[in-house]
Swiss-Prot record:
SUPFAM superfamilies: Nitrite and sulphite reductase 4Fe-4S domain-like (SSF56014), Nitrite/Sulfite reductase N-terminal domain-like (SSF55124). This is Sulfite reductase [NADPH] hemoprotein beta-component. InterPro entries: CysI (IPR011786), NiRdtase/SiRdtase_haem-b_fer (IPR005117), Nit/Sulf_reduc_fer-like_dom_sf (IPR036136), NO2/SO3_Rdtase_4Fe4S_dom (IPR006067), NO2/SO3_Rdtase_4Fe4S_prot (IPR045169), NO2/SO3_Rdtase_4Fe4S_sf (IPR045854), NO2/SO3_Rdtase_FeS/sirohaem_BS (IPR006066). The gene is cysI. Keywords: 4Fe-4S, Amino-acid biosynthesis, Cysteine biosynthesis, Heme, Iron, Iron-sulfur, Metal-binding, NADP, Oxidoreductase. One of its GO terms (biological process) is hydrogen sulfide biosynthetic process. It catalyses: hydrogen sulfide + 3 NADP(+) + 3 H2O = sulfite + 3 NADPH + 4 H(+). Signal peptide: none annotated. Its EC number is 1.8.1.2. Belongs to the nitrite and sulfite reductase 4Fe-4S domain family. Its cofactor is siroheme; [4Fe-4S] cluster.
Amino acid sequence: MTQKHPQTLVVDAPLSDAERLKRESNFLRGTIAEDLNDGLTGGFNGDNSTLIRFHGMYQQDDRDIRAERAEEKLEPRYAMMLRCRLPGGIISPEQWLKMDSFASEKTLYGSIRLTNRQTFQFHGILKKDLKTVHHLLHESGLDSLATANDVNRNVLCTSNPVESDLHAEAYEWAKKISEHLLPQTHAYAEIWLDQEKLATTDQEPILGATYLPRKFKTTVVIPPQNDVDIYANDLNFIAISENDQLVGFNVLIGGGLSITIGDKTTHPGVAKDIGYIEKEKVLAVAEAVVTTQRDWGNRSNRKNARLRYTLERVGLDVFKAEVEKRAGVTFEASRPFTLTGRGDRFGWVKGIDNQWHLTLFVENGRLLDYPHRPLKSGIAEIAKVHKGDFRLTANQNLIVAGVSEEDKDTIEKIARDHGLLENISELRKNSMACVSFPTCPLAMAEAERFLPNFLTKVEAVMTKYDIADEYIVFRTTGCPNNCGRSLLAEIGLVGRAIGRYNLYIGGDRVGTRIPRLFRENITEDEILSEVDSLIGRWAKERDGKEAFGDFVVRAGIVKAVTDPAIDFYD
């Protein structure tokens, strides 16, 4: 990253309207409670439709029928998407069964969507059922606070069931970080849980009265796995162990993938290393990074408000020095670590505690009862007999964790009977798509509904070139916000319009390199033609087991992106 001498630590420009909204919200209350009682509309009005995001919900409508309803002079079919706060992705079978019942009985789509941020979403909750789901979450020991908007989002932690002791400690740090950085406002409890308003004035000592300039994403990773995609997140703690004991963390800051097509002041970025800390300093450092971004981040232009842009504006060293000052730490030189891959370990693996763990592939995270493949019911049936826990992965899959030797056969039979243990190609296992249509209001092209059939065609190409057992990290996202993390894939598709995508190639398998734009605004047939040609060359010309992304760079098909702030658009 190019170091700059800061002209000013704070952007001197008029604040965006989002800042007005937060300032006037009375610590995220707005008039949400009044809107809940408005039976004339299925949605929330004005600022409230944005404020509910801080409470973990997005107002959406079914875009498949939007035009039809408009012709009939009806408002869109508004329904809410709710995202649970689940640091580290661990949920008990008892909790899961309650969530499963709600999805079946109280949502328009009857599904549970696993996300690539290790949690789950309900799509299609009617306004009248919102308090029901929040009470259900609360009674189950869960909530949805701060899973969206300008706060620290759900904290990720490597899904590592094998090294159980190390994972347990890393997971506890993920939970502690999540709790430490949560909003302190009582608004969530007042509005959704009917708790009485406190006589004291709300305080937000970490996030501040207007919260953060933009979303903020945090991870804890246990090398060599990079399933949580550390380089795509604002704040990352890389676990360093000695003699199988956690001793501290390397800290990386400033990753992010969202861009705005046509605006070259926006670009993706990979997180940068700022040094090593002892584990006891984690919360102090997390707070210092967040508060420095709170104070220095761009509150004028939301497109340039993420931490990576703050680092570019003030300089990485300046930001690091401020974090050291606020946290009362001095970063040591980073400890060496190695990343070997991002994929999940499917099937049964045995942990050092002699417990078994079964990782199940859930295509694009959608748990639904399909004809002949009742996936959602299968997980529920497993939950009824499972004595361990479930772990949701950052690849949108699910681990049945902590299975005893005597329970293995029972769990496996349920999974197999419900289509949860089918033979899946390596390509498909390493794929990912965001939700996109019909529920996402930002979607420009299909993603989740597009990728499965398209991958079938790519699998045929792999078979044609006799490399069906190989894989490419292949991701699709419906818009440039990049929720599907396409801009850290070997092949990434970014939606531009219905049936059209930008094609990016040249990322690496472990997730350290941004891919480059190869073809712009092309159709599915054109994408398949390009991919066929590229895979053909890779199969023929690669160096041994050279990965696809590394090959297209070495062969000169695209130039590697080395510093996205400078050369992403070259």
